Amino acid sequence: MKLKVTVNGTAYDVDVDVDKSHENPMGTILFGGGTGGAPAPRAAGGAGAGKAGEGEIPAPLAGTVSKILVKEGDTVKAGQTVLVLEAMKMETEINAPTDGKVEKVLVKERDAVQGGQGLIKIG
């Protein structure tokens, strides 16, 4: 399996051997707005569980907003990094899933967010 990993702003292409005997029973987990199979199932709503609305880019995991790279009114392209989340001392780039215009930035830098919470609305 080939993966693209970004470390400290430098992108690397990585080959990974997959041990099929230890498949993840939770399904596919996507980070940084990547594409792939179905997203991992979400836990049943508990206190503070976030849920992105229509047109909103959801946080793929709980963390802290490190950088917001766009502002309302900006035009974005699919795959463009729009925000960076920090979780467990690792940065995760959040990419626009489609081309569009930033309608609303729903968070501020240093905000704590929950997995699934809407970050940016694109129309």
UniProtKB/Swiss-Prot annotation:
Keywords: Biotin, Transferase. Its EC number is 2.1.3.1. PROSITE patterns: BIOTIN, BIOTINYL_LIPOYL. Residues 46-123 form the Biotinyl-binding domain. It catalyses: (S)-methylmalonyl-CoA + pyruvate = propanoyl-CoA + oxaloacetate. InterPro entries: Biotin_BS (IPR001882), Biotin_Carboxyl_Carrier/Decarb (IPR050709), Biotin_lipoyl (IPR000089), Single_hybrid_motif (IPR011053). It holds the Pfam family Biotin_lipoyl. This is Methylmalonyl-CoA carboxyltransferase 1.3S subunit. The modification N6-biotinyllysine is found at K89. The biotinyl 1.3S subunit serves as a carboxyl carrier between the substrate-binding sites on the 12S and 5S subunits. It comes from the Bacteria. Disulfide bonds: none annotated. It is an enzyme of class 2 (transferase). It comes from Propionibacterium freudenreichii subsp. shermanii. One of its GO terms (molecular function) is methylmalonyl-CoA carboxytransferase activity. Transcarboxylase is composed of three subunits: 1.3S, 5S, and 12S. The core of the enzyme is composed of six 12S subunits. On each side of the core there are three pairs of 5S subunits. Each 5S dimer is attached to the core by two 1.3S subunits. Thus the total number of chains is 30 (6 + 12 + 12).
